[in-house]
Amino acid sequence: MFAIIKTSGRQLKVEKDQTIFVEKIDKNEGETITFTDILFINGKIGTPYVENASVTGIIEKQGKAKKIVVYRHNPKSTHKRKLGHRQLFTKVKITELKG
């Protein structure tokens, strides 16, 4: 059994006991989170969401992804710009699919 949830502007296919990485959610590690924007579960397709359906998970970790380097250079001048970015993420383990 699987479900398709919508979180942080993305759609994710999830199953029970699966670990997913989503954009940062303001909760502490060990807390329970419930996703209510369910697009598909048990063969039911939502319009746009399935009613009375939810996916529950436990937050395992809050962290930062690896650094990416953004480098911009204008070849007609000596202008250069180098920036780094580390995206915040939340690691969630799916514990229950209801619906």
UniProtKB/Swiss-Prot annotation:
It holds the Pfam family Ribosomal_L21p. GO terms for molecular function: rRNA binding; structural constituent of ribosome. Keywords: Ribonucleoprotein, Ribosomal protein, RNA-binding, rRNA-binding. The keyword Manganese does not apply. It comes from the Bacteria. GO terms for cellular component: cytoplasm; ribonucleoprotein complex; ribosome. InterPro entries: bL21-like, bL21-like_sf, Ribosomal_bL21. The keyword Magnesium does not apply. Part of the 50S ribosomal subunit. Contacts protein L20. Belongs to the bacterial ribosomal protein bL21 family. This protein binds to 23S rRNA in the presence of protein L20. This is Large ribosomal subunit protein bL21. It comes from Mesomycoplasma hyopneumoniae (strain 232).
